[in-house]
Amino acid sequence: MARGLQVPLPRLATGLLLLLSVQPWAESGKVLVVPTDGSPWLSMREALRELHARGHQAVVLTPEVNMHIKEEKFFTLTAYAVPWTQKEFDRVTLGYTQGFFETEHLLKRYSRSMAIMNNVSLALHRCCVELLHNEALIRHLNATSFDVVLTDPVNLCGAVLAKYLSIPAVFFWRYIPCDLDFKGTQCPNPSSYIPKLLTTNSDHMTFLQRVKNMLYPLALSYICHTFSAPYASLASELFQREVSVVDLVSYASVWLFRGDFVMDYPRPIMPNMVFIGGINCANGKPLSQEFEAYINASGEHGIVVFSLGSMVSEIPEKKAMAIADALGKIPQTVLWRYTGTRPSNLANNTILVKWLPQNDLLGHPMTRAFITHAGSHGVYESICNGVPMVMMPLFGDQMDNAKRMETKGAGVTLNVLEMTSEDLENALKAVINDKSYKENIMRLSSLHKDRPVEPLDLAVFWVEFVMRHKGAPHLRPAAHDLTWYQYHSLDVIGFLLAVVLTVAFITFKCCAYGYRKCLGKKGRVKKAHKSKTH
């Protein structure tokens, strides 16, 4: 250290003590959590872990039948009854995920997708009804005096509950269908350069892509109604007055968006929108002896991590065998999260596991590639750790995520329905052997990590902020209080247009009057002149 920068140790210790003593620590608060099951919960769980470490209490509300939400030390789990069993739930979920790999006629696939969407929507709504009509539980929640509700607005039940209990809400979200996030924040959303969800458009669109971008919401209007309208009806019933979907999504004090401008395209944001992309990369842990042994045995070739997310762990036999054949043709050891029937052609370099520490494996320097369904959870772990991807998107925003990463040169996208064993083999060899993929993902990783505050700390800060101040009304734009024609200034435009037209009309009338006067006078002069000459 330079002589001029040296500080005596006692003085340094005293300074640090003073700094800590004036730090505005939040008092212990109570957080009510209404999560969405699946990978969104896995990210939210990290925020709850940190809130617990800072002295806050969290209560997680969940149906007693679910996929991943189980009791843990850093929160209290409160489960409520639903009219189906775990076996029924698992069977239906497996049926949905198996359908991702079935080749069907376009209309049949669309029809099946609509049926799935409708069934999922009905199930979520039924869960919400069971929760809100559980009078004993609602009384208990009301008496507990929670400081904030943390919820994922993909399931609007959390918004209904927060509004019903009059507790400030923080939304923890990645995407909501039907642009409800833009409507809930009153954030500008021009279709000219902000691609709509599920379109796979970029922010630089051709004319036809802009046409598609504008018309796509109309095509999804049925899905939007199916997805959101039941919650508005339920809220209207509870409040005994008309409540719209926009009223529900506008209730949030702060929106914690699990994205950033490394993965997402530049777009406008509002003051109460906070970007926490990569929050799930926090709290990395050392690998167990089992996985360390797999990596050590891989030698100089390293490993490939293969997981299709929290929902998909079984694949139809024919497709599984094609995948296994491709995996056997690369020199790397493949760790494949898979619980289905073991493919008969599984090679010696491929190890099937029921669970794997995905983020910790991706963070190991011997990991060469990541085979993923391109969910935002996995994509961010790939970005955080700088691992190129082979992406096999299955549903939802995964197609958009894959398109963005492929455009940025961070991976290769395969159509899971059409890909062959050779396609997967070539894609793996490309991302492993072509240095450009590694360089591109490392560049994205460097950009993502170059930030003043870690995403987890930022998320926890804003939850504590809302608890301390009982909301954030100063961040709420006045646009929420305008009618649609006021928002677009149509009344002002109409008024100014009327003024211009009125002035133009008066000017025209004056000119016409003056013209007639002048013309009449000139005519009389000519007539008088003619009479004199005669």
Curated annotation (Swiss-Prot):
Instruction: Give its E.C. classification number.
Output: 2.4.1.17
Q: Which reaction does it catalyse?
A: glucuronate acceptor + UDP-alpha-D-glucuronate = acceptor beta-D-glucuronoside + UDP + H(+); calcidiol + UDP-alpha-D-glucuronate = calcidiol 25-O-(beta-D-glucuronide) + UDP + H(+); calcidiol + UDP-alpha-D-glucuronate = calcidiol 3-O-(beta-D-glucuronide) + UDP + H(+); calcitriol + UDP-alpha-D-glucuronate = calcitriol 25-O-(beta-D-glucuronide) + UDP + H(+)
Q: Which residues form the signal peptide?
A: 1-28
Q: Which UniProt keywords apply?
A: Endoplasmic reticulum, Glycoprotein, Glycosyltransferase, Lipid metabolism, Membrane, Signal, Transferase, Transmembrane, Transmembrane helix
Biological processes annotated in GO: bilirubin conjugation; heme catabolic process; negative regulation of fatty acid metabolic process; vitamin D3 metabolic process
Induction is noted as: Induced by phenobarbital.
User: Matching InterPro entries, A to Z?
Assistant: UDP-glycosyltransferase, UDP_glucos_trans, UDP_glycos_trans_CS
Which GO terms of the cellular component aspect does the record hold?
endoplasmic reticulum; endoplasmic reticulum membrane
* Cellular location(s): Endoplasmic reticulum membrane
What molecular functions are annotated in GO for this chain?
enzyme binding; enzyme inhibitor activity; glucuronosyltransferase activity; protein heterodimerization activity; protein homodimerization activity
Specify the protein's topology with respect to the membrane. Answer: Single-pass membrane protein
User: Sugar-bearing residues?
Assistant: 119, 142, 296, 348
> Which Pfam family would be a valid example here?
UDPGT
- Which stretches are annotated as coiled coil? none
Q: What is its main location?
A: endoplasmic reticulum
- The transmembrane segments are 492-508
* PROSITE patterns membership: UDPGT
Query: What does the subunit comment say?
Result: Homodimer. Homooligomer. Interacts with UGT1A1, UGT1A3, UGT1A6, UGT1A7, UGT1A8, UGT1A9 and UGT1A10 to form heterodimers. Isoform 1 interacts with isoform 2/i2 suggesting that oligomerization is involved in negative regulation of transferase activity by isoform 2. Isoform 1 also interacts with respective i2 isoforms of UGT1A1, UGT1A3, UGT1A6, UGT1A7, UGT1A8, UGT1A9 and UGT1A10.
| UniProt similarity note | Belongs to the UDP-glycosyltransferase family.
Other facts noted in the record for this chain: UGT1A4 isoform is part of the UGT1A complex locus which displays alternative use of promoters, first exons and terminal exons. The locus is defined by 13 first exons, which are alternatively spliced to 3 other common exons and 2 alternative terminal exons 5. From the 27 possible mRNA isoforms, 9 produce functionally active polypeptides (UGT1A1, 1A3, 1A4, 1A5, 1A6, 1A7, 1A8, 1A9 and 1A10) called isoforms 1 (i1). Use of an alternative exon 5 (5b) as terminal exon is leading to 9 additional alternatively spliced products termed isoforms i2 and which lack transferase activity.
- Report the protein name in the record: UDP-glucuronosyltransferase 1A4
